[in-house]
Amino acid sequence: MNSDYYDYDALLKRAVSQLPEEVFKDVRFEVPHADSFVEGNRTMVKNFVDISKVIRREPQFFAKYVLKELGTAGDVEGPRLILQGKFGNYIINSKIKKFVDEYVLCPECGKPDTKIIKEGRIHFLKCMACGAMKPIKLI
């Protein structure tokens, strides 16, 4: 047999070469802040769809979470989210950050390269960079 077959350094190099490129990227992920304003008794988040594209989640799924956390009704209309009630930027941004922590960032490596997949009756947050899977509860 070839002695390189069991050589530790050769095995390590081979294993590292098979890892996806995302593992080696050290790019800082930043969620854009909500651009919101109050109009009458409603709050509008102007860049809601843009935020959902950055975090790579469906706007309806993301909106459902924000609405539940704020305890209000609302709807996605075009590129914005309309909330019933008056909410400040701080509270909206804190709910967005909480969503990102629970449903976007990998619990193992902290990267945002994740997908929500379903296996059987259980939904998982699967990291495409490191391969970790975490069970999550849907909204």
From Swiss-Prot:
Transmembrane segments: none annotated. InterPro entries: IF2/IF5, TIF2_bsu_arc, Transl_init_fac_IF2/IF5_dom, Transl_init_fac_IF2/IF5_N, Transl_init_fac_IF2/IF5_Zn-bd. Keywords: Initiation factor, Protein biosynthesis. SMART domains: eIF2B_5. Pfam families: eIF-5_eIF-2B. SUPFAM superfamilies: Translation initiation factor 2 beta, aIF2beta, N-terminal domain (SSF100966), Zinc-binding domain of translation initiation factor 2 beta (SSF75689). The keyword Flavoprotein does not apply. One of its GO terms (molecular function) is translation initiation factor activity. eIF-2 functions in the early steps of protein synthesis by forming a ternary complex with GTP and initiator tRNA. Heterotrimer composed of an alpha, a beta and a gamma chain. Belongs to the eIF-2-beta/eIF-5 family. This is Translation initiation factor 2 subunit beta.
